[in-house]
């Protein structure tokens, strides 16, 4: 049987943790939670992991995903310092080798490669275990190159089904 894990998630927008609302990213507002005061990423990350301990935290950088910005490295660095020993999976809309290499060079975690951001399967095959693959879909529609969904030979060990 394959391993299955529940991984806590933070969505970042404009330097704050935001609350998801049915996928309507434009209307996400800073989170209000009984876990911690405010919406500062490192504070929320530490509180979330105290409530749901685990070895991994998924961070979606919505500014990078939606606006094409570079990942918010200062926020990721603060999260990493606040949560020692926790591996970060970072979704920043990575779609090209240069952006991925720059992120990998930062040493801040493993990039999450979303199938919806890819034009072909070569980047996934090239990165192998360095990344996490997210197989994205909308309803029954598979997003991104069909080969990413159909050919598991190039998948890393860690795959997310969205």
Task: Say what each PLM segment does.
Residues 9-34, 98-162:
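Conserved anion-binding
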Residues 36-43, 88-90, 157-162:
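Short C-terminal domain-edge/linker segments immediately following a structured domain
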Residues 41, 72, 96, 144-145:
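Amphipathic coiled-coil/heptad-repeat helices and related helical stalk/stem segments
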Residues 2-6, 53-56, 84-88, 108-109, ...:
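Short, well-ordered coil/turn segments that N-cap beta-strands
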Residues 17, 21-70:
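N-terminal beta-alpha supersecondary unit
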Residues 50-51, 55-106:
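N-terminal active-site wall of soluble small-molecule enzyme domains
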